[in-house]
């Protein structure tokens, strides 16, 4: 009886000791779990990882201690897992489960066939540009679905090793036969006979220096060399070929550039030569745009909405050469809606290096004091059916006298000067003196009296020098009081 009681007391004391130890460990575990909860709320990933490892380590030690074949073990003495509380059982079961930090990596799933570079054969290029799927129904295939390229290419970079350019895009990828790059409705470009290798497009990015000595791109404002491919042989790229075809058909408005064209004459003569050769250059043909009526009366062709801080605007278009510009000694072209006034030639340049002529015209008189209209005509010797015109509208200082328009004071002074010139033309007889006073034929330039103010003389000379009227001319003056100097 005594032995049984002592055995019971020993078992009770051992159980109490184990219970107290378990209680302390549960308290420690509860504190760690609270710290872990706060660390997650405060977004401290380092502390979260450390606390999770401590919790797992504690549970592993506890489980190892319980499984030891020791007399002090409650399980060894007949205790079962069911004798523990539900919380301890749940923790012991969680310890048996492997978490993400300690579990082994699962076998990776096989990648799709289109992401394998060896099996897919440049699938990124096919998926991004859709060049092998067939001809595009919406124009240029190089533009369609371009937004998916970065996403598709990103799936092929795993960070293990850098991929070479030819490994990604497979330079031996071929287009389907008869691929014309979206120019299905452009008979002038024709179609491609046979496949085109993508490696042929690499020189378009950075052509060699020698290429710039050959023919340039036919687009009027592009100085890059033409590549010579079958379906855009006169252009540097398919994009410029599309621009030249779509921006220059008949019926379109002239090319407009707020701020000016900003190109030298060489590119403009090159565009004219390309047009004469039957190429599309991106400049429309506008028949009579500069000569049928005044440009300020043609809003359907010339937009005159001046932008903020804009001081110059230019238009560019093709038209038939107007030989009427050279009619008469004054080389002028009257406009039907401007009371017989219009364009006056001020300069003619023989451009030997380009094989053509450049003529400059000014509007006489200018319609406004603070705006000036100028017209430039480009012609080449080998083409008589087409000329290139550059129309210019320029904001000038209103205080300065506008070119091509003489102030009223200057006209009045010149009328007085003409009245003092009778001494240079003596009357033939007394009977015809009265008639000749009303009607005289004055040849050559009028000589200004030395008594006239020098300011008016300088103003008149500047007008003559500016517009290049250097030859002799005849005026038939009917009434000196109505004489008008244009």
Swiss-Prot record:
Its main location: cytoplasm. Keywords: Activator, Cytoplasm, DNA-binding, Metal-binding, Nucleus, Phytochrome signaling pathway, Transcription, Transcription regulation, Zinc, Zinc-finger. GO terms for cellular component: cytoplasm; nucleus. Residues 208-405 are annotated as: VOZ. One of its GO terms (biological process) is long-day photoperiodism, flowering. It comes from the Eukaryota. A zinc finger (C3H1-type) spans 217-240. The keyword Zinc-finger applies. Zn(2+) binds at residues 217, 222, 236, 240. Residues 429-438 have a biased composition (Low complexity). Ubiquitous. Expressed in the vascular bundles of various tissues, specifically in the phloem. It is found in: Cytoplasm; Nucleus. Residues 424-445 are annotated as: Disordered. Disruption phenotype: No visible phenotype. Voz1 and voz2 double mutant displays a late flowering phenotype under long-day conditions. Induction: By far-red light. One of its GO terms (molecular function) is sequence-specific DNA binding. InterPro entries: VOZ1/VOZ2. Transcriptional activator acting positively in the phytochrome B signaling pathway. Functions redundantly with VOZ2 to promote flowering downstream of phytochrome B (phyB). Down-regulates 'FLOWERING LOCUS C' (FLC) and up-regulates 'FLOWERING LOCUS T' (FT). Binds to the 38-bp cis-acting region of the AVP1 gene. Interacts with phyB in the cytoplasm and is translocated to the nucleus at signal transmission, where it is subjected to degradation in a phytochrome-dependent manner. The VOZ region includes a DNA-binding domain and a dimerization domain. Contains an atypical zinc-finger followed by a basic region structurally related to the NAC domain. Homodimer. Interacts with phytochrome B (phyB). This is Transcription factor VOZ1. It comes from Arabidopsis thaliana (Mouse-ear cress). The lineage of its organism: Eukaryota, Viridiplantae, Streptophyta, Embryophyta, Tracheophyta.
